[in-house]
């Protein structure tokens, strides 16, 4: 056991402990600390999982003061998940209430960027023996803290995409009136596809609606100091969703520089770092400070001017710094909201108002304000587990079995109406309406049709001849039978819904939208993989072309073009090709448009005799539609020299050639140097995947994002002689010393007296939770 350290500077930098400490011999304190550390380590490293036959445990992801997280595989489907075990979940009231709060919140939320509960294992033991809670969550390989402080490339596109997902999930959370209060990189889970999910809702609280709730809001507030908003440190009593936006700004700045923005060693140092960048708070903020001594301390400091963000992050994107400056402000009301941040130009590439939902209804924190005993909390957790399974079984029943629908009462069939043929004689059409009154007319018109009923003709008279095209009786009978059969078939096959009242369209459920988003994400992943494959293939071809052809290799080798781009490239290549060499007998090509003056003098003679006139080539053809000159390729006889020996030039004795009225481009006499540039521009017409490149390998996460608390294994393995004055080390932990109240609550059920806890607290360098107003002395270190 290492020799006990001397007391560090503490939160106030005065070297005095936060409160009265009982003086004990060094040997006694060391033995007590050793015993407590052994107990703490044994309890936290309990990794025995009893998950039955449904899941197969793969490996442990992380462990902490609240539980252990392991990756697992569901045997039925092969899906990989994360299982969080909370051992002895009901021993300490604070921890039990934290578990209940997190279960309720995660059951209420359904969002892509918030960790989701996939299952809660039912207890397999009697109620009296039920002690451990198993929660099945989404499996994420790493967290943002591991990504930032690793050798993994982190481009501006990665930063943009991570920030967008964080704000998208935060907008959904804030719409439910929930404040996370503990946002930090290790609580943001990330996978190899750059997907981000917010985790660890054990510290979440609702909005404060009255001054009486301020104390409730600060209960158990032991969040990481480096990401804590100024209103919490200065007791401004303005606890809104802007608290989370300050944390997001600190995370944003950490991603840009890959180092913490405000890594304070204690409360005073933290406040000094903030004022070094943001300057002295405004008089309104200073007057709102709740403690008189804190207000006097800030006023005694020399005034500071804010430092431009371009100086803090030289070379960073201007739009990124603009958004960062709107997040990190002393006044909570002056900070940008999550919804407004999503509309910032820096995130315009991903912003889609239709795909950034809100949460309805708001989450109810009424249960959290009640004074609950351990037994009542245990009953509430068991009720939450049963409610989760009841809802899931109800959804499955709705999917498997449709509700039985009562058939519609059969109505009497429509009477059969025999429609007369339009070509049938008027005597066959029986009119039931009264005959119209005859109109007075001077004489009978020869073409008038008498619609009045006429007496049937005598039997002796022959029947009028049947006109061509009339509907026969057999056809009428067949149509009547077909209509009757169709009506009976409809009544027999479709009794589930009334014909006159069609079933209303069902609203789109959250699960359907989730499936749509998963399908979109899958397509994006496929496009990203295809793009990566094309890039590797292009690099391979370029390397092969460079080896075989040297500097003269084709610069377009491996470039993938669409059909339209390839067609445009071929046209451009034809335009850029030099004209084919012509023999001496060939006349020079005329301009593409406009009459050219014929030369009056003799043409210059070539250096070789002309070929036979029988094989003379035809004149070049001009396409009228395009106005482009397309000379036919001419093959010189074998006896002629190459094209370099011929020099046939057009001759215009009256001056320069007339301009082309159509403005058509002239064919070039040499290879155009812009073909490569044009080709690359044409290739950009293809739709690009906006997502950043996937990670080739993600570092293993610590499991902190699953809400297991601080990592005891990493914490206890550190050397005890590493004082706080040495400063935090990047990449080792993303939090300063945590609160001793966590340890006190955790060991509450073991009968440890305050002296033992205080001794262990000093041994492992854990500070007591306090506000800046409680510090006995405020002096700059």
UniProtKB/Swiss-Prot annotation:
<feature type="region of interest" description="Disordered">
    <location>
        <begin position="402"/>
        <end position="708"/>
    </location>
</feature>
<dbReference type="InterPro" id="IPR000719">
    <property type="entry name" value="Prot_kinase_dom"/>
</dbReference>
<feature type="modified residue" description="N-acetylalanine">
    <location>
        <position position="2"/>
    </location>
</feature>
<keyword id="KW-0418">Kinase</keyword>
<keyword id="KW-0539">Nucleus</keyword>
<feature type="binding site">
    <location>
        <position position="84"/>
    </location>
    <ligand>
        <name>ATP</name>
    </ligand>
</feature>
<feature type="compositionally biased region" description="Polar residues">
    <location>
        <begin position="668"/>
        <end position="685"/>
    </location>
</feature>
<feature type="region of interest" description="Required for binding to MAP2K5">
    <location>
        <begin position="78"/>
        <end position="139"/>
    </location>
</feature>
<dbReference type="GO" id="GO:0005634">
    <property type="term" value="C:nucleus"/>
</dbReference>
<feature type="compositionally biased region" description="Basic and acidic residues">
    <location>
        <begin position="527"/>
        <end position="544"/>
    </location>
</feature>
<keyword id="KW-0723">Serine/threonine-protein kinase</keyword>
<dbReference type="InterPro" id="IPR003527">
    <property type="entry name" value="MAP_kinase_CS"/>
</dbReference>
<feature type="compositionally biased region" description="Pro residues">
    <location>
        <begin position="454"/>
        <end position="463"/>
    </location>
</feature>
<feature type="compositionally biased region" description="Basic and acidic residues">
    <location>
        <begin position="502"/>
        <end position="519"/>
    </location>
</feature>
<feature type="region of interest" description="Necessary for oligomerization">
    <location>
        <begin position="140"/>
        <end position="406"/>
    </location>
</feature>
<feature type="modified residue" description="Phosphothreonine">
    <location>
        <position position="698"/>
    </location>
</feature>
<comment type="subunit">
    <text>Interacts with MAP2K5. Forms oligomers. Interacts with MEF2A, MEF2C and MEF2D; the interaction phosphorylates the MEF2s and enhances transcriptional activity of MEF2A, MEF2C but not MEF2D. Interacts with SGK1. Interacts with PML. Interacts (via N-terminal half) with HSP90AB1-CDC37 chaperone complex in resting cells; the interaction is MAP2K5-independent and prevents MAPK7 from ubiquitination and proteasomal degradation. Interacts with STUB1/CHIP; the interaction is enhanced in the presence of IGF1 or MAP2K5 and promotes STUB1/CHIP E3 ligase activity.</text>
</comment>
<dbReference type="GO" id="GO:0106310">
    <property type="term" value="F:protein serine kinase activity"/>
</dbReference>
<keyword id="KW-0067">ATP-binding</keyword>
<dbReference type="GO" id="GO:0005737">
    <property type="term" value="C:cytoplasm"/>
</dbReference>
<feature type="compositionally biased region" description="Low complexity">
    <location>
        <begin position="642"/>
        <end position="652"/>
    </location>
</feature>
<feature type="binding site">
    <location>
        <begin position="61"/>
        <end position="69"/>
    </location>
    <ligand>
        <name>ATP</name>
    </ligand>
</feature>
<dbReference type="Pfam" id="PF00069">
    <property type="entry name" value="Pkinase"/>
</dbReference>
<dbReference type="GO" id="GO:0004674">
    <property type="term" value="F:protein serine/threonine kinase activity"/>
</dbReference>
<keyword id="KW-0221">Differentiation</keyword>
<comment type="function">
    <text>Plays a role in various cellular processes such as proliferation, differentiation and cell survival. The upstream activator of MAPK7 is the MAPK kinase MAP2K5. Upon activation, it translocates to the nucleus and phosphorylates various downstream targets including MEF2C. EGF activates MAPK7 through a Ras-independent and MAP2K5-dependent pathway. As part of the MAPK/ERK signaling pathway, acts as a negative regulator of apoptosis in cardiomyocytes via interaction with STUB1/CHIP and promotion of STUB1-mediated ubiquitination and degradation of ICER-type isoforms of CREM.</text>
</comment>
<dbReference type="GO" id="GO:0005524">
    <property type="term" value="F:ATP binding"/>
</dbReference>
<keyword id="KW-0131">Cell cycle</keyword>
<feature type="domain" description="Protein kinase">
    <location>
        <begin position="55"/>
        <end position="347"/>
    </location>
</feature>
<feature type="region of interest" description="Disordered">
    <location>
        <begin position="1"/>
        <end position="27"/>
    </location>
</feature>
<feature type="compositionally biased region" description="Basic and acidic residues">
    <location>
        <begin position="563"/>
        <end position="573"/>
    </location>
</feature>
<dbReference type="GO" id="GO:0000165">
    <property type="term" value="P:MAPK cascade"/>
</dbReference>
<dbReference type="GO" id="GO:0030154">
    <property type="term" value="P:cell differentiation"/>
</dbReference>
<dbReference type="InterPro" id="IPR011009">
    <property type="entry name" value="Kinase-like_dom_sf"/>
</dbReference>
<feature type="compositionally biased region" description="Low complexity">
    <location>
        <begin position="615"/>
        <end position="632"/>
    </location>
</feature>
<feature type="compositionally biased region" description="Pro residues">
    <location>
        <begin position="433"/>
        <end position="445"/>
    </location>
</feature>
<feature type="active site" description="Proton acceptor">
    <location>
        <position position="182"/>
    </location>
</feature>
<comment type="similarity">
    <text>Belongs to the protein kinase superfamily. CMGC Ser/Thr protein kinase family. MAP kinase subfamily.</text>
</comment>
<keyword id="KW-0808">Transferase</keyword>
<keyword id="KW-0547">Nucleotide-binding</keyword>
<feature type="modified residue" description="Phosphoserine">
    <location>
        <position position="685"/>
    </location>
</feature>
<keyword id="KW-0597">Phosphoprotein</keyword>
